[in-house]
A protein has these predicted regions:
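N-terminal ordered "arm"
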Residues: 1-53
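Internal, well-folded beta-alpha domain core
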Residues: 49, 53-235
């Protein structure tokens, strides 16, 4: 067994709210979570290999150990914007909110990731060619529209390369001025049926979808009214 490492370059702004955030607000995470990565792999498996193969492979994908190597720089743009959302109560006839959707204001954050994003998967057999094929098919991470481009074919390595952080694993040291964020992952109880958006089954935060407090090696370098600039801390 070895580590399987893939590097992606963001080709669009990244955005991914924490699992507990509401639809009208919430800060964006600075990196994709293991949960988001595994859902992207599952999506690639369903599209390229079919639902039957994806269902059979899901327990293996779900239990993967995921490590991240963040881009060297990240710039977060924050703003308020208008969106349309379903009306919970019927609006008065003739009002500007008449119809199934109403206008409201929400808070949004978008992250510009400067540099390659590394993903590593632990305890992977060199014979697992299917996982390699699915990593080739990932084209976005986080919120839909956060497009990424694979920089080179995934490679195997005996040890985890430097600058990678294992989400949910034991931590021997971390930067004192790092950024703490909650990165979610799949619990062992998350079945393929619940992971499928077509089954109607819900995924419960804190049960099938668990969070890990993770110190990201980012240091705030500069900030203003509408932006925050982070730089990766390299030991």
């Amino acid at each position: 067994v070895a580590w399987l490492v893939a590097e992606y370059q963001s080709t669009a702004l990244f955005s991914l709210k924490p699992a507990w955030a509401t639809s009208s607000g919430g800060k964006s995470l600075l990196a994709p979570t293991p949960y988001a990565v595994k859902m992207a792999i599952l999506d690639a498996a369903c599209r390229t290999s079919g639902a039957a193969v994806a269902e059979k492979s899901w327990p293996r994908v779900r239990d993967l150990v995921v490590a991240l190597r963040l881009p060297e720089h990240a710039v977060v743009t924050n703003l308020f914007t208008r969106i349309l959302k379903p009306n919970r109560t019927p609006p008065p006839p003739g009002s500007q909110h008449a119809g199934p959707l109403g206008k409201t204001i929400c808070y949004r954050e978008y992250v510009y990731l400067d540099g390659p994003l590394g993903l590593a998967f632990g305890e992977v057999s060199r014979e697992e060619s299917q996982l390699v094929d699915w990593l080739l098919q990932i084209n976005y991470l986080g919120k839909r529209g956060g497009f990424v481009q694979l920089l080179a074919p995934p490679t195997f390595t005996e040890t985890l390369p430097g600058a990678f952080i294992t989400v949910g694993g034991s931590v021997e040291s971390f930067p004192a001025d790092g950024i703490v964020q909650q990165l979610d992952d799949c619990d062992a109880s998350l079945t393929f049926e619940k992971a499928s958006i077509y089954s109607g089954k819900s995924i419960r935060t804190g049960r099938e979808r668990v969070s890990h407090h993770t110190v990201l090696p980012y240091r705030l370098k500069r900030s203003g009214k509408s932006f925050s600039y982070y730089e990766r801390v390299d030991d």
